Swiss-Prot record:
Matching Gene3D superfamilies: Hypothetical protein TT1679
Organism whose genome encodes this protein: Streptococcus equi subsp. zooepidemicus (strain MGCS10565)
Superkingdom of source: Bacteria
Pfam short name (any one): DUF436
Protein family (similarity comment): Belongs to the UPF0340 family.
HAMAP family given in the database record: UPF0340
Protein name from the UniProt record: UPF0340 protein Sez_1726
Amino acid sequence: MDLKVLREEARSILIDVVERSAIKKGQLFVLGLSSSEVLGGRIGQHSSLEVGEVIVKVVLEELSSRGIHLAVQGCEHINRALVLEESVAEEYQLELVNVLPSLHAGGSGQLAAFKYMKQPVEVEAIAAHAGLDIGDTSIGMHVKRVQVPLVPIQRELGGAHVTALASRPKLIGGVRARYQPDPIRK
Protein backbone atom coordinates (compact mmCIF):
# COMPACT_ATOMS: atom_id res chain seq x y z
CA MET A 1 0.00 0.00 0.00
CA ASP A 2 1.31 3.43 -0.96
CA LEU A 3 1.29 5.40 2.30
CA LYS A 4 1.54 8.77 0.53
CA VAL A 5 -1.63 8.00 -1.42
CA LEU A 6 -3.29 6.76 1.79
CA ARG A 7 -2.36 9.99 3.58
CA GLU A 8 -3.75 12.23 0.85
CA GLU A 9 -6.94 10.21 0.40
CA ALA A 10 -7.54 10.25 4.18
CA ARG A 11 -6.97 14.02 4.22
CA SER A 12 -9.41 14.55 1.33
CA ILE A 13 -12.12 12.42 2.96
CA LEU A 14 -11.67 14.14 6.33
CA ILE A 15 -11.81 17.66 4.90
CA ASP A 16 -14.99 16.78 3.01
CA VAL A 17 -16.66 15.40 6.16
CA VAL A 18 -15.55 18.29 8.38
CA GLU A 19 -16.76 20.91 5.93
CA ARG A 20 -20.15 19.27 5.34
CA SER A 21 -20.79 18.32 8.97
CA ALA A 22 -20.88 21.95 10.17
CA ILE A 23 -18.67 20.99 13.15
CA LYS A 24 -17.26 24.03 14.95
CA LYS A 25 -14.09 24.99 16.75
CA GLY A 26 -13.97 23.44 20.23
CA GLN A 27 -16.30 20.56 19.37
CA LEU A 28 -15.57 16.81 19.45
CA PHE A 29 -14.89 14.62 16.41
CA VAL A 30 -14.70 10.83 16.74
CA LEU A 31 -12.57 8.62 14.51
CA GLY A 32 -13.20 4.90 14.19
CA LEU A 33 -10.47 3.07 12.30
CA SER A 34 -9.78 -0.50 11.25
CA SER A 35 -6.32 -0.68 9.72
CA SER A 36 -7.08 -4.32 8.89
CA GLU A 37 -9.97 -3.22 6.67
CA VAL A 38 -7.84 -0.50 5.06
CA LEU A 39 -5.38 -3.23 4.08
CA GLY A 40 -8.21 -5.34 2.64
CA GLY A 41 -8.52 -7.77 5.54
CA ARG A 42 -11.19 -8.45 8.14
CA ILE A 43 -11.62 -6.03 11.02
CA GLY A 44 -9.31 -6.88 13.92
CA GLN A 45 -7.39 -9.58 12.06
CA HIS A 46 -4.37 -7.81 10.50
CA SER A 47 -3.83 -4.56 12.40
CA SER A 48 -1.10 -2.28 11.08
CA LEU A 49 0.54 0.30 13.30
CA GLU A 50 2.00 2.00 10.23
CA VAL A 51 -1.43 2.48 8.63
CA GLY A 52 -2.89 3.67 11.94
CA GLU A 53 -0.14 6.22 12.36
CA VAL A 54 -0.52 7.63 8.84
CA ILE A 55 -4.28 8.11 9.20
CA VAL A 56 -4.35 9.38 12.78
CA LYS A 57 -1.52 11.83 12.15
CA VAL A 58 -3.26 13.45 9.17
CA VAL A 59 -6.63 13.53 10.95
CA LEU A 60 -5.06 15.08 14.05
CA GLU A 61 -3.21 17.69 11.96
CA GLU A 62 -6.32 18.72 10.03
CA LEU A 63 -8.61 18.86 13.06
CA SER A 64 -6.06 20.67 15.24
CA SER A 65 -5.61 23.35 12.59
CA ARG A 66 -9.36 24.02 12.89
CA GLY A 67 -9.48 23.87 16.70
CA ILE A 68 -11.57 20.68 16.64
CA HIS A 69 -10.87 17.99 19.26
CA LEU A 70 -10.13 14.42 18.13
CA ALA A 71 -11.26 11.31 20.00
CA VAL A 72 -10.10 7.95 18.62
CA GLN A 73 -12.41 5.03 19.33
CA GLY A 74 -10.89 1.73 20.40
CA CYS A 75 -12.15 -1.71 19.52
CA GLU A 76 -14.68 -3.83 21.35
CA HIS A 77 -11.94 -5.47 23.46
CA ILE A 78 -11.68 -2.24 25.45
CA ASN A 79 -15.42 -1.53 25.24
CA ARG A 80 -14.92 1.06 22.49
CA ALA A 81 -13.25 3.45 24.93
CA LEU A 82 -11.81 6.60 23.38
CA VAL A 83 -8.43 8.30 23.59
CA LEU A 84 -8.32 12.08 23.59
CA GLU A 85 -6.32 14.89 25.14
CA GLU A 86 -6.52 15.17 28.93
CA SER A 87 -7.43 18.87 28.65
CA VAL A 88 -10.43 17.95 26.48
CA ALA A 89 -11.57 15.32 28.98
CA GLU A 90 -11.40 17.98 31.69
CA GLU A 91 -13.19 20.59 29.55
CA TYR A 92 -16.05 18.19 28.81
CA GLN A 93 -16.00 16.69 32.34
CA LEU A 94 -15.50 13.17 31.01
CA GLU A 95 -14.82 10.26 33.33
CA LEU A 96 -11.44 8.64 32.77
CA VAL A 97 -10.94 4.88 32.52
CA ASN A 98 -7.71 3.00 33.05
CA VAL A 99 -6.51 1.07 30.02
CA LEU A 100 -3.47 1.19 27.78
CA PRO A 101 -4.24 0.17 24.20
CA SER A 102 -2.30 -2.47 22.34
CA LEU A 103 -2.38 -3.45 18.69
CA HIS A 104 -5.08 -6.09 19.33
CA ALA A 105 -6.91 -4.39 22.21
CA GLY A 106 -7.65 -0.82 21.27
CA GLY A 107 -6.01 -0.99 17.88
CA SER A 108 -3.54 0.86 15.71
CA GLY A 109 -5.53 4.11 15.75
CA GLN A 110 -5.43 4.31 19.52
CA LEU A 111 -1.72 3.47 19.63
CA ALA A 112 -1.09 6.23 17.09
CA ALA A 113 -3.17 8.68 19.14
CA PHE A 114 -1.07 7.86 22.21
CA LYS A 115 2.02 8.58 20.11
CA TYR A 116 0.88 11.89 18.60
CA MET A 117 -1.25 13.45 21.34
CA LYS A 118 0.40 15.53 24.06
CA GLN A 119 -1.40 14.12 27.13
CA PRO A 120 -3.57 11.21 25.96
CA VAL A 121 -6.14 9.70 28.28
CA GLU A 122 -8.91 7.14 27.85
CA VAL A 123 -12.59 7.82 28.49
CA GLU A 124 -15.53 5.45 28.35
CA ALA A 125 -17.95 7.52 26.29
CA ILE A 126 -18.45 10.85 24.55
CA ALA A 127 -21.15 12.63 22.58
CA ALA A 128 -19.20 13.88 19.57
CA HIS A 129 -20.61 16.42 17.17
CA ALA A 130 -19.42 14.48 14.10
CA GLY A 131 -17.27 11.54 13.16
CA LEU A 132 -15.57 9.45 10.52
CA ASP A 133 -15.78 5.65 10.41
CA ILE A 134 -13.08 3.90 8.38
CA GLY A 135 -13.77 0.17 8.19
CA ASP A 136 -17.26 -0.18 9.72
CA THR A 137 -16.16 0.25 13.34
CA SER A 138 -19.59 1.52 14.48
CA ILE A 139 -18.95 5.02 15.83
CA GLY A 140 -22.66 5.78 16.28
CA MET A 141 -22.62 5.14 20.02
CA HIS A 142 -20.25 8.10 20.40
CA VAL A 143 -22.07 10.66 18.23
CA LYS A 144 -24.76 12.83 19.79
CA ARG A 145 -28.37 12.81 18.68
CA VAL A 146 -29.75 13.52 16.13
CA GLN A 147 -27.26 11.76 13.88
CA VAL A 148 -27.18 12.72 10.22
CA PRO A 149 -25.47 10.28 7.84
CA LEU A 150 -22.93 11.84 5.50
CA VAL A 151 -21.76 10.05 2.39
CA PRO A 152 -18.08 10.99 2.05
CA ILE A 153 -16.62 12.20 -1.24
CA GLN A 154 -14.78 8.86 -1.37
CA ARG A 155 -16.57 5.76 -0.04
CA GLU A 156 -13.48 3.59 0.39
CA LEU A 157 -10.02 4.11 1.83
CA GLY A 158 -7.83 1.26 0.69
CA GLY A 159 -10.08 -1.75 1.22
CA ALA A 160 -12.15 -0.12 3.98
CA HIS A 161 -15.72 1.08 3.62
CA VAL A 162 -15.97 4.70 4.78
CA THR A 163 -19.00 6.35 6.39
CA ALA A 164 -19.50 9.51 8.41
CA LEU A 165 -21.96 11.10 10.80
CA ALA A 166 -22.84 14.68 11.64
CA SER A 167 -25.36 15.72 14.28
CA ARG A 168 -28.05 18.34 14.63
CA PRO A 169 -30.46 19.47 17.35
CA LYS A 170 -33.79 17.65 17.58
CA LEU A 171 -36.66 19.25 15.68
CA ILE A 172 -39.51 19.69 18.15
CA GLY A 173 -42.90 21.37 18.08
CA GLY A 174 -44.79 19.70 15.27
CA VAL A 175 -46.57 21.26 12.30
CA ARG A 176 -46.91 24.74 13.85
CA ALA A 177 -43.23 25.08 14.64
CA ARG A 178 -40.63 26.86 12.55
CA TYR A 179 -36.96 25.89 12.50
CA GLN A 180 -33.53 27.37 11.97
CA PRO A 181 -31.92 26.53 8.60
CA ASP A 182 -30.09 23.20 8.61
CA PRO A 183 -26.37 23.89 8.02
CA ILE A 184 -25.69 20.23 7.17
CA ARG A 185 -28.29 19.83 4.41
CA LYS A 186 -28.00 23.22 2.74
